[in-house]
Every structure is written in C-alpha cells, then in structure tokens.
Curated annotation (Swiss-Prot):
Descriptive protein name: Enolase
GO cellular component: cell surface; extracellular region; phosphopyruvate hydratase complex
Gene: eno
Stated family: Belongs to the enolase family.
Entry's Gene Ontology BP terms: glycolytic process
Residues annotated to bind (2R)-2-phosphoglycerate: 163, 340, 369-370, 391
The organism's taxonomic lineage, starting at the top: Bacteria, Bacillati, Mycoplasmatota, Mollicutes, Acholeplasmatales
Residues the record lists as binding Mg(2+): 242, 288, 315
Length: 430
C-alpha cells in the first residue's frame, strides 16, 4: 500500500535565482512523488505566508531552510503511515498542524510542497498521469493559453505601469495551433521591437520588456505584431491585461498613479472609464486585477460597467481563497478568479476554490507565478479541472515552455480533447 514512509525536502532555485522548496514523498509501495513550489513577485496582502529565513547572510534573506526543516522535522512525523490516496485527509492534517489561518507557522511553501508531492505519489501508485488522477474521468478540454508577451510593472525594469500584456489565440482550432499562433506573434513582436530600436530583453515571465511611452503603446505594438504574423485581431487572437493595480495604488491619496501617464492620478471610477476606452478601442477580452485588492467599491463599479463584456479576473482580490471568493460572488464583484496553488497552500483548498467558482459561473484561470521552476503541475491542473484557460508566460524561458510542452503531451494523450476557444468565456453576454 502507498503509506508514507519518508518525506525529504531541499532548498532549490527558482527562475529568478531565489530559493524555493522541493519536496519528495516516498511510500512503502515504492510509489514516489516530487513537487517544487513557485514564488510570486507581486503578492496579494491576503495570500498564505511564504516562509523565508530573513538571514541577510544567505540569499539576501530569502533562504527557505526553515521551511525545509519544517517539512522534515514537523510534517514528516505527522504524516508517516498515512496513505497518499487520502489527499483531503492529508491536507486537513497539514492545516491543523500549522494551526494558523494563513499558514504562517510552517509556511505555505512547505505545506504546498508536501500536498502536491503526496498527490503525485498517489498518481504514481495508480499508474496515472497527474491530470488523470486529479480529474478522474472529467478531463476533456484543453486550455486557452494567455501568453504574456510584454512585461511591465513588478515583472520588468521598464516604464510600463501594467504588469502583463497578453495575447489569447482564441480562434485557433486546437491547443497545438494556439501555441503556434502565439509563438509566431511573439517572434514577430521581437522583430518589430528591433526595427523600432527597442530592446528585446525579457522579463520574469518571458515576455519582452521594452521602454514604451505608455500602456496603450504596448497594446498598439502587439496589434502590429498580430497583423504582421498574418492573424486577425479580435478573431484569431484577442488581448488581455494583468494591470496589477495594487502595485500603483497610492494609499495616502487613495488614487491610482500611472507613471507612464506623467504620474497622472486616477480615482477608481476614472480608472474604470480609462479601461472602458481601451476595451472600446482594442480587442481586449480579459482584465486582471484592474483595481486594488481592497477597493471593493471600485471593483463593484468595474463589474457593473464591463462585467458583461469582458472577463474581470480577481487575483490579489481573491487570492485563491473560498472566503474571499464567496464575498465576491455575493456582491457580484468580478466574474473570474485566478488560481495560484501557493496563494492558498494545499491542493484540496485549490480544488474547492475552483469548484466554488464554477458553481457561481465564474471562470477559473490556472496560473503560474513570476518565480517558476521546471515543475509542470499547473499544466495538468488546467486540464484536470477543465478550467479552459492557463496563464503560464510567454514563448521564452524554459520554466514557461515546460508547461506548454506538457500540455502538448496531454493533448496527444487525450486525442479528442476539444479546444473551445471563445466558448471558454461562457459567462460573457456581449
């Protein structure tokens, strides 16, 4: 039987060269599971706590030796002898042992690593792919890739306020073709930037990070790349933005200050009207974190104005948390949630959040973090849950490409899994 025999953990590096936690779970049956935990750059105030050592002599204080120690010295003794097939029980026990509402005792990075490694050991024991184990008979849909081709904000050192400008190859007939559409646009965008004398260095998530005059210029140059690649904006490929508005919200004056707009300040309503102008002008189908995570009144107004037209994704707003999401659903705020495993800290809680979103007709976007690794868990999770969308960066950096390549493998295995394209956005009315 797949009873837990030992749990190992180590400090490894993520795509930014910062330490993170890798966990290996071994069972008496010989079944084995391994997981590496990602890390974010722009993090919501209400996320589960990522435990760091704060020892300035190691990794500028970002070491995770205490989290590793918590896995081997605290968690392992508690889980020894449990079957990895009891995922819900394991995750509840992890939460109980931690004993805090935000996992600040053991660290969400320690807890998530164990949670995922146990699930992967269970899949290994049953000789199933991870998406098959998590999704059972349900996996039947390939996700639309939300490809971050221009990085700004906290993900790049440039003059662009908004954190991500994405392309969504919604008009493609399959995931494989959608990936091709995106890759071709990415390369055309690189050529255009070079022609304009702009740098083609990339940000944390593999997108270009040029110094542009405004956020709108980013949209314009992406449209140029789409057309240059031979695709039609608004038909073959749509646009999306992760504004990450909390990053430029000034709490003192309670305004949103856009550096690229000559430090012009916007009230919540003024920023919503700015978005309305962009949506009317460009084929934008998704805006993430359009307002500060605590600006619930502003979010309410944003949803009233644009909620029927485009996808309004809550990341920092909901932090993959059922309590936060329930509040949003009750108040009709947003219509989509970004799903990040390490925001909540266990596989079970993540699946519960996705289920809650679906029951309320909110879409769920499975997402990476800016600090990623070769771990491809989120690719399997997107298919297992039929989320229909995945956000895992651009067409560069192996830590991003690893997820896309895993999805290509899964698409081959599922053979007839549909790519629903525009139908993925089932809750939009206009």
């Amino acid at each position: 039987m797949p009873y837990i025999e030992s749990i190992l953990a180590r400090e490894v590096l993520d795509s930014r060269g910062n330490p993170t936690v890798e966990v290996e779970v071994y069972t008496e049956s010989g079944a084995f599971g391994k997981a590496i935990v990602p890390s974010g750059a722009s993090t919501g105030q209400h996320e589960s706590v990522e435990l760091r050592d704060c020892d300035a002599k190691r990794f500028l204080g970002k070491g995770v030796l205490q989290a590793v120690k918590n896995v081997t010295e605290v968690i392992q003794p508690e889980l020894e002898g449990y079957s990895v097939l009891e995922q819900t029980l394991i995750d509840k026990l992890l939460i109980k042992v931690d004993g805090t509402p935000n996992k600040s005792n053991l660290g969400a990075n320690a807890i998530l690593g164990v949670s995922l490694a146990c699930a992967k050991a269970a899949a290994n024991y049953l000789n199933l792919e991870f998406y098959q184990y998590v999704g059972g008979v349900w996996p039947k849909q390939m996700p639309v890739p939300m490809m971050n081709v221009i990085n700004g904000g906290a993900h790049a050192s440039n003059s662009v306020d908004f954190q991500e400008f994405m392309i969504l190859p919604i008009g493609a007939p399959s995931f494989k073709e959608a990936l091709r559409y995106g890759a071709e646009v990415f390369h055309h965008l690189g050529k255009i930037l070079k022609q304009k004398g702009l740098p083609t260095t990339v940000g944390d998530e593999g997108g270009y990070a040029p110094d542009l005059n405004s956020n709108e210029e980013a949209l314009q140059i992406i449209l140029e790349a789409i057309k240059s690649a031979g695709y039609e904006p608004g038909k073959d490929i749509f646009l999306g933005m992760d504004v990450a508005a909390s990053e430029f919200y000034d709490k003192k004056i309670q305004k949103y200050v856009l550096a690229s707009e000559n430090n012009k300040s916007f009230s919540s309503k003024e920023l919503v009207h700015y978005y309305e102008t962009l949506v009317a002008k460009y084929p934008i189908i998704s805006i993430e974190d359009g307002l500060d995570e605590n600006d619930w009144d502003g979010w309410k107004y944003l949803t009233q104005k644009l909620g029927n037209q485009i996808q309004l994704v809550g990341d920092d707003l909901f932090v993959t948390n059922t309590q936060k999401l329930a509040k949003g659903i009750e108040n009709k705020i947003g219509n989509s949630i970004l799903i990040k495993l390490n925001q909540i800290g266990t596989l079970t809680e993540t699946l519960e959040t996705i289920e809650m979103a679906k029951k309320a007709s909110y879409t769920a976007v499975i997402s990476h973090r800016s600090g990623e690794t070769e771990d491809t868990t989120i690719a399997d999770l997107a298919v297992a849950t039929n989320s229909g969308q995945i956000k895992t960066g651009s067409c560069s950096r192996t830590d991003r490409i690893a997820k896309y390549n895993q999805l290509l493998r899964i698409e081959d295995q599922l053979v007839e899994a549909p790519f629903l394209g525009l139908k993925t956005f089932y809750n939009l009315k206009k």
